[in-house]
Amino acid sequence: MLFGTAVVTGVMLMWPLVSRLLGASTPQVGPTEAVQLINRRDALVLDVRDKTDFAAGHIPNARNIPLPELDGRLREIEKFKARPIVINCQSGARSAGVCGLLKKNGFGEVFSLRGGIGGWVEASLPVEK
């Protein structure tokens, strides 16, 4: 019992380091935090889903650049480098990689929307078509 407690405690103490090494340090925001960034700091919402998914429903005022096109279209969002950017995908899985790409290209504050559009809808927040 004591050994098990020691192992669990050790894992908990090491978790921040391990998660950083595994790339889990991508800043995430939930839907409520994203709304605050949008309203208070004029954050850009970048939706990296394909055009069909975007047309079916997206966060109001989101800009759509499908993930396969993003690298070639970064110039379109250059003017937003000084603003927070919330990356949105279907479930939140792809947006972490996009955050890394934007960081490497000089974008300062980038956040992955936890749960993606699904989390947004689940929080009963508006979508437009």
Predicted features along the sequence, with ranges:
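Rhodanese-like catalytic fold shared by cysteine-dependent sulfurtransferases
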Residues: 1-43, 51-84, 94-129
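Conserved beta/loop motifs at nucleotide-recognition and modification sites
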Residues: 46
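Short, surface-exposed ligand- or partner-binding patches at beta-edge/loop junctions that are enriched
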Residues: 87-88
